[in-house]
């Protein structure tokens, strides 16, 4: 009888520890995607990198290998509510532009930085891309990004982020697809993205018992407060860290004439102080 009980206890404890290990692995896998630094949050993501180019387009300089954006599709569908992330090679902003801002210069600098990234990460593929007028490169990859920014124009929200590291997944083989060059009166044949991938981002309304919620630098109650957000303020979801939501908020000025500055905030709010916005 004791032997049977002993075996039963062994089986029970083995199953118990297996469940704990599986739970811990799942938790660590998600939290490993968020790197907390004193300079802000860095997301370390695995997924698919994609870029297309069209040198038959008359607006594309001959020296430019790509005209499309560097896009990243996170493996974790929870990131930015399963939206495509457009990778920006340099620091960027959509607000508070300097009066002397030179769009053409910035565009040229970004194109140059983009090509440098491609040549560094995909040296062999770039050689092939240079011989193809129109095509698409796709590869499993891992990225580290910061300054995640959901930006809405008209009815579409695009998620942008500054890429600070891009790596091919070891052993993975990038794929280059050659596309047909169409006549000027024909439509483009790049794959149209799913409208949901560029649609409205998941949003939450602040709904705290105290009438406001603290947006914190890190997902702890003793972390530095970045901003106090009143109830009814809408924030945009990026990802979560346990019971804390990492969100984005753009504070537009009430008096543009005297102070046109838009203030951007990214930080953590406990999920108990938020409610999902329903359209």
Q: In which residue ranges do the predicted regions lie?
A:
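Structural detector for short beta-strands of small beta-barrel domains
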Residues: 32-84, 89-90, 143
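Bacterial Sec-dependent N-terminal signal peptides
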Residues: 1-30
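SH3/SH3-like beta-barrel fold
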Residues: 72, 232, 245-250
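Beta-strand/loop nucleic-acid-binding surfaces
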Residues: 79-131
């Amino acid at each position: 009888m004791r032997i049977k009980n002993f075996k039963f206890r062994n089986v029970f404890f083995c199953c118990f520890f297996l469940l704990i290990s599986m739970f811990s692995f799942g938790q660590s896998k998600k939290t490993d995607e968020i790197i907390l630094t004193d300079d802000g949050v860095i997301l370390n993501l695995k997924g698919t990198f994609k870029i297309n180019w069209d040198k038959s387009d008359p607006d594309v300089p001959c020296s430019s290998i790509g005209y499309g954006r560097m896009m990243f599709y996170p493996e974790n569908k929870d990131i930015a509510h399963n939206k495509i992330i457009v990778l920006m090679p340099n620091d960027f902003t959509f607000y508070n532009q300097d009066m002397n801002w030179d769009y053409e210069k910035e565009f040229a600098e970004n194109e140059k930085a983009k090509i440098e990234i491609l040549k560094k990460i995909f040296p062999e593929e770039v050689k092939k891309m240079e011989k193809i007028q129109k095509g698409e490169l796709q590869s499993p990859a891992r990225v580290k990004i910061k300054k995640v920014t959901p930006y809405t124009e008209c009815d579409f929200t695009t998620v942008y982020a500054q890429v600070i590291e891009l790596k091919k997944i070891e052993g993975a083989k990038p794929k280059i697809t050659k596309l047909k060059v169409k006549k000027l009166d024909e439509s483009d044949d790049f794959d149209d993205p799913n409208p949901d991938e560029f649609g409205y981002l998941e949003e939450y309304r602040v709904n705290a018992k105290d009438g406001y919620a603290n947006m914190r630098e890190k997902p702890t109650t003793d972390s530095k407060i970045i901003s106090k957000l009143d109830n009814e303020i809408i924030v945009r979801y990026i990802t979560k860290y346990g019971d804390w939501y990492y969100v984005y908020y753009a504070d537009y000025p009430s008096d543009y004439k005297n102070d046109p500055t838009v203030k951007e905030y990214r930080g953590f709010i406990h999920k108990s102080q938020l409610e999902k916005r329903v359209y």
